[in-house]
């Protein structure tokens, strides 16, 4: 009898663990719709700047910059206007290298520099598989967007943590787990020092100052914005903020004193972050060298 009960308990534990197990598509859903915030660029918005959820990922914001004019493309599995005809390997290459497949109307053409392939390069193989599984599962929507116009060669500044990569040992450390999330979330793409189209990740990591004019990453009609200093500097950055204040800014878009954060800050996506992931992100931000 005791043996039977013990076996039953083991079976119940196994069933419980299986019930909690996350499928690749679920993991992809979590990454795409939280820290990576893919819909922030790739989903259309209404006249009030609100996401049109029933048209998610069918093409979104237009970026009109000195180097290029590009509309975030349709990444639904529609075969004609989206990525439905792309192989898994081609989707992964677009993510981590920023290059389209060698077939179709735009064969081999680089994706615009706003696509953060220099950050996505850090994605772990299992996470890449998960993202592809999720994108395959979203509703296909027929929607052709305008072709990109390039005024200069596409360039992406190497991001140190993405170049170094993340081994499995890194995930035992909350700070390194946070670094991975901040990397694939391309937070420092906006929040690092920026000059003449070049990011300064070496001496300006997290210092902010990048200016986003109204047509560079903001919904139609929205004002421009300037990325904030997110280093732990006590006055210029977030060093004096509590963990709760940092968490609220990330997930609600509200800073200390009630200041509302502006686009392209993707707090509506970050609101779904797991508490553990949010804590790791904060731990990493606390570890960044303070800059003024």
Annotate the PLM regions.
Residues 56-93, 118-128, 186, 201-249, ...:
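Electron-transfer interface patches adjacent to heme c in soluble/periplasmic c-type cytochromes
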Residues 101-123, 256-272:
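A cross-kingdom feature marking solvent-exposed beta-strand/loop segments within repeated
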Residues 143-154:
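Extended, well-folded interaction surfaces typified by the phenylalanyl-tRNA synthetase beta subunit core
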């Amino acid at each position: 009898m005791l043996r039977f009960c013990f076996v039953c308990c083991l079976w119940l534990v196994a069933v419980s663990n299986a019930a909690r197990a996350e499928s690749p598509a679920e993991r992809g859903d979590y990454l795409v719709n939280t820290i990576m915030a893919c819909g922030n660029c790739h989903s259309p918005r209404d006249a009030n700047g609100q996401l049109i959820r029933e048209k998610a990922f069918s093409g979104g914001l237009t970026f009109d910059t000195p180097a290029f004019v590009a509309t975030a493309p349709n990444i639904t599995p529609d075969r004609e206007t989206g990525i439905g005809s792309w192989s898994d390997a081609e989707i992964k290459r677009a993510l981590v290298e920023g290059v389209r497949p060698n077939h179709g109307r735009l064969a081999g053409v680089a994706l615009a520099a706003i696509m953060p392939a220099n950050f996505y390069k850090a994605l772990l193989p299992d996470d890449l598989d998960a993202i592809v599984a999720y994108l395959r599962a979203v509703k296909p929507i027929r929607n052709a967007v305008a072709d990109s116009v390039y005024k200069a060669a596409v360039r992406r500044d190497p991001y140190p943590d993405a170049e170094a990569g993340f081994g499995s040992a890194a995930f035992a450390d909350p700070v390194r787990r946070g670094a991975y999330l901040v990397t694939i979330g391309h937070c420092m793409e906006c929040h690092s020092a920026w000059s003449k189209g070049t990011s300064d990740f070496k001496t300006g990591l997290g210092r902010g100052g990048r200016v986003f004019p109204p047509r560079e990453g903001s919904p139609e009609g929205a004002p421009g914005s300037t990325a904030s200093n997110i280093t732990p500097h006590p006055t210029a950055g977030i060093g004096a903020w509590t963990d709760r204040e940092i968490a609220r800014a990330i997930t609600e878009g509200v800073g200390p004193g009630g200041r509302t954060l502006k686009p392209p800050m993707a707090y509506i996506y970050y609101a779904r972050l797991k508490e553990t992931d949010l804590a790791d992100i904060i731990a990493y931000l606390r570890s960044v060298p303070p800059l003024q």
